[in-house]
Amino acid sequence: MADITVVNDTGELYNVINQKKSEGYLESELTIISKSKLHLNDLHDSEISLISTSGTFSDKMTKLLTGEDGEHAVLSRYNLAPDELEKYKQLILDDKMLVVGVRDHSSHQEVLENNSAYEEVDITHFAEASKGPKA
């Protein structure tokens, strides 16, 4: 379930990010959703996802042709109830920002077990003709 916090300005944004980190969220588990692109260099250099609902030029043209709603498209990935979706959509349109925290419960154990880069290398291999190490 997504933990969504509404933020009014960039000063408050940094406080909420620090609060989420103190609650145990990793940067990769945080997303900031805003109406327009945020120009915050320190966030661009982090693992926090920055999503603007206005999108790129091609996104705007697609919305114009298909009638797709950018806010709805971004918020739909969080499986919100229809009334919550409309509430957050309106907040974004009112130039508020949303800080969304979604815990990553996936396990990376399979990678650790099956990736050859993590294997212990056994270097006790000798040439068959030598019959063991030379003394």
UniProtKB/Swiss-Prot annotation:
It comes from the Bacteria. Pfam families: YflT. Belongs to the UPF0355 family. This is UPF0355 protein MRSA252. It comes from Staphylococcus aureus (strain MRSA252).
